[in-house]
Amino acid sequence: MAERTNIYYWKCDREDAFHGTSDYQKDQSAFLTVVRKTLEERFGGALTDVVSSCGQGNHRTFEAVLDGQKVFIRTEDGMEKDNYLAVESAVTNRVAALGIPVPETMAFDCSRKQGFAWQVLPFLPYRDLNAYVKDGTIVWTGIAEQIGTGVARWQEISVDGFGPFCTAEAMATGGLRTLHPNYESYYRLNLAKHVRFLVDGEFLSERDACRIMKVIGAHERFLNLARGVLVHKDLAVWNILGTESEVKSFIDWDDCIVGDPMDDLSLMGVTGEDSVTRKIVAAYGRVRDLEGDAGTRFWLCWLRNILFKAVIRQGAGYFKKSSDEFFLIGGGRNGADLAAVTRQKIEKALGALEKGGGFDAL
């Protein structure tokens, strides 16, 4: 069983980097047979109608009926034998206890008796918000308020230390324990490696790389956090289910960490429009303080997040996609457009930090 001690972000730092970021879910008939057998052994005749789902994330996903209820099944079959599904289940139980809408974990098993970990969740009959963004029907007023408030409220969960949680602890006790003693060590983890990857792939220039490291170095005092908060770490419209005007569930917590209170807010900026991010930040600010150095830390989080996302997008070939069918690519656009937006997001963070790092740069 692997811990995430050397992982800043799983999808790009894992040993089998970019596993599950391609089209590997398209033909999984053989794996479906194994999943069906494994779950039938666990649930017997209570489980029926197991079929492949159509997820675009890094888990193979399925749908089924359990005790007459439609359910959603996520599996993790990577070579690292990562069991972070146990952490996710422990975290979402705590988030749900705050009254925040998240999927309830009905059952999970990280024993890997059949070579994979699995998790059973209720099937939620809602589209992700990205679908409404793409077809132009989303109503941001109420949704932005719910997102900002949701982030502020799940930050009530605070654990000593920083970074990813210890999988062994979650599996043994259901408890939460982090893997890094301070925030700066987590923030800088694999940073140079990520920047070098982007330079070697000709996404960034050597000059860009020097500028990035210089800007971060000039602001390193803001990485000295006394205590962190729960961070979703993959917060985006495709990880929120709902209607055109209402959030129904914050999903996919399998990258959650303890980090900076500004992290999840910055992620909404990295993956969305500035006008929407301003609304989300304002909603957050009605619940939690945004004074002091919050603006600078927001842009530091933004920069670190767009860098790891650029690594994933380049490494997984997203910049080469020719249509908007992939969830990351906006309607009517392609991979080249995604590359251009990614560069713009990097430049935005660098420019904001070089000019003082306030929220007015949004």
Model-derived segments and spans:
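Juxta-kinase regulatory segment immediately upstream of eukaryotic protein kinase catalytic domains
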Residues: A2-G44
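An alpha-helical support segment within catalytic cores of ATP-dependent transferases
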Residues: D27-A46, V139-E145, E156-K233, D289, ...
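Short, surface-exposed alpha-helical segments at coil->helix boundaries
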Residues: S29-T33, L85, S89, R278
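ATP-binding pocket architecture of kinase catalytic cores
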Residues: V51-R177
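Active-site acidic catalytic loop and adjacent metal/ATP-binding pocket
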Residues: R60-V65, I73, A117, R211-D263
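Generic structural signal for small/hydrophobic residues in well-ordered secondary structure
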Residues: T61, I73, T92, T105, ...
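Glycine-rich, phosphate-binding/catalytic loops in enzymes
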Residues: A90, T137-I138, M171, S249, ...
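Helix-rich C-terminal or lid/interface subdomains of diverse kinases
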Residues: T141, E145, N224-R227, L267-L362
